[in-house]
């Protein structure tokens, strides 16, 4: 059947090496990309003493987000 490699005393054909390589690479990618995904922690609620303070904090955060987008 053509050329073959002798690895650890066994005859291994080139197509078997190719299939083994493809399976190993795809299997590694699947294993690496699977698993538990870490959830992003939610932002804590605003702890304001009064409604005016809460409005000030909310307005400040909106301004900062707008400045970051620019």
From Swiss-Prot:
* UniProt keyword terms in alphabetical order: ATP synthesis, CF(0), Hydrogen ion transport, Ion transport, Membrane, Mitochondrion, Mitochondrion inner membrane, Transmembrane, Transmembrane helix, Transport
**Highest taxon of the source?**
Eukaryota
Q: Name one GO biological process term.
A: proton motive force-driven ATP synthesis
Its placement in the membrane is given as: Single-pass membrane protein
The keyword Membrane is annotated on this UniProt entry: yes
Q: Which PANTHER family match?
A: ATP SYNTHASE SUBUNIT K, MITOCHONDRIAL
Q: How does it assemble?
A: F-type ATP synthases have 2 components, the catalytic core F(1) and the membrane-embedded component F(0), linked together by a central stalk and a peripheral stalk. The central stalk, also called rotor shaft, is often seen as part of F(1). The peripheral stalk is seen as part of F(0). F(0) contains the membrane channel next to the rotor. F-type ATP synthases form dimers but each monomer functions independently in ATP generation.
What is the documented function of this protein? Mitochondrial membrane ATP synthase (F(1)F(0) ATP synthase or Complex V) produces ATP from ADP in the presence of a proton gradient across the membrane which is generated by electron transport complexes of the respiratory chain. F-type ATP synthases consist of two structural domains, F(1) - containing the extramembraneous catalytic core, and F(0) - containing the membrane proton channel, linked together by a central stalk and a peripheral stalk.
Name by which UniProt lists this protein: ATP synthase subunit K, mitochondrial
The organism of origin for this protein:
Yarrowia lipolytica (strain CLIB 122 / E 150)
Upper lineage ranks?
A: Eukaryota, Fungi, Dikarya, Ascomycota, Saccharomycotina
The gene behind this protein is: ATP19
